[in-house]
Amino acid sequence: MDHDKVTISNLHRQVMFTSDDVGKYKVNILKKKIYKINKKSKVKTYRVKAEYKNLGKILKQYDVIVDGTDNFKAKFLLNKFSLKYKKKLIIGAISKFEGHIFTFDFNLKKSPCLKCFYQGEPAEGVLDCETDGILGSTAVITGSLQANEVLKAILNVGKNLNSHILIIDLLNLKFRKVLFRKRKGCICENI
């Protein structure tokens, strides 16, 4: 799901695109590239913006929701609908040299949500690709670890990050796994 077209500013951090893709819709390019990798793939694309009016209808159909958005408004909407439909949600966020990965399984009563960690939505422009800048390797490493969480969720193997955030600090080459719990009064308190 993406309504956006490839721009020059995407190329250093969104490695599936090349300069030949600039000006074309991201979902169309990705679908073609996935088919080149595996012709038997089943890919359904949505060339729409992640908004309240369309997310409920779309997310209902899937077991695992993967966030690759670049804004917190969309992340919190994905959180809300994943919680509502009791989906697994894997979120990635990046800024400069730092990446964050969350895994939520809303079938588990103890699972916190994104609002438990941030205690509300960050101000507009916080962790914004356009203003903060993103190191390409930060996006690739965070995305790879996020993909690993997705595979574990689909295959139901290994230990996932539920109730934790993985903080990736590439400037100092440190990885921290931090526990956090449901926050009293949060939207997830009564699930």
What are these regions (language model features)?
Residues 1-191:
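Adenine nucleotide-associated cytosolic modules
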